[in-house]
């Protein structure tokens, strides 16, 4: 698969949230406002790209040492360290976004979309450059999905609907419709 195919696949046909259902916790928790969703998406994109690069190197070392069974544990440790770096950066340089993301920023550590992209890179046997591209494109797909969903939620929250649908019930219906829309991309032949 060429680079453009990998990018389009990560953005649309294999979107981590709407197709693979990775990263649902921040998708539902941080998607009430577009600006917060965009900040979370950018942070996740940065961590996914960096984690793809760092975990590629870690995986090479594990293969040389014959310790492939330690992949998941070490990948989580690498991701946790990267999230701490992002958290320190945001706290120092973008304190408003740091406060807006709140508890969801440290939760990027356990965001399965970040771990998912690293494991996909290893499973597909991507080289260093393609791993970074797939990580960044996967993060941009995450950002696209969460920002689209945040814009839907902002409009839905202002609408007049029955009391029993307010909050998460209507948000889940909107998420389902968004996932259904992205299912339309599954017919694309990207090779």
Language model feature labels by segment:
Residues 1-5, 57-70, 119-132, 187-191:
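Helix-coil boundary and interhelical linker segments in multi-pass alpha-helical membrane proteins
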Residues 3-18, 66-81, 133-145:
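Structural signature of hydrophobic alpha-helical transmembrane segments
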Residues 6, 13, 44, 49-50, ...:
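Hydrophobic core segments of alpha-helical transmembrane domains in multi-pass membrane transport
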Residues 6-43:
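Juxtamembrane transmembrane-helix termini in multi-pass membrane transport proteins
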Residues 21-29, 88-93, 104-107, 112-125:
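Generic transmembrane alpha-helix signature in multi-pass membrane proteins
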Residues 35-46, 70-75, 97-109, 164-170:
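Cytoplasmic-side transmembrane-helix entry/capping segments in multi-pass membrane proteins
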Residues 60-102:
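Ordered, amphipathic secondary-structure segments that act as subunit-interaction surfaces
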Residues 154-172:
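Interfacial loop-to-transmembrane junctions
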């Amino acid at each position: 698969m060429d680079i453009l195919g990998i990018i389009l696949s990560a953005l649309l046909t294999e979107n981590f949230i709407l197709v693979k259902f990775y990263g649902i916790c921040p998708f539902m928790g941080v998607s009430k406002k577009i600006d917060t969703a965009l900040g979370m998406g950018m942070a996740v994109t940065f961590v996914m790209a960096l984690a793809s690069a760092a975990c590629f190197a870690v995986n090479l070392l594990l293969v040389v040492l014959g310790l492939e069974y330690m992949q998941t544990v070490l990948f989580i440790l690498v991701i946790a360290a990267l999230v701490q770096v992002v958290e320190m950066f945001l706290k120092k340089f973008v304190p408003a976004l740091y406060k807006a993301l709140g508890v969801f920023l440290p939760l990027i550590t356990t965001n399965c979309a970040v771990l998912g992209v690293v494991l996909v890179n290893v499973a597909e046997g991507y080289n260093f450059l393609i791993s970074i591209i797939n990580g960044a494109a996967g993060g941009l797909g995450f950002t696209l999905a969460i920002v689209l969903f945040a814009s839907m939620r902002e409009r839905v929250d202002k609408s007049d609907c029955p009391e029993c649908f307010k909050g998460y019930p209507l948000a889940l219906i909107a998420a389902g419709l968004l996932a259904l829309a992205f299912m339309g991309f599954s017919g694309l032949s990207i090779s």
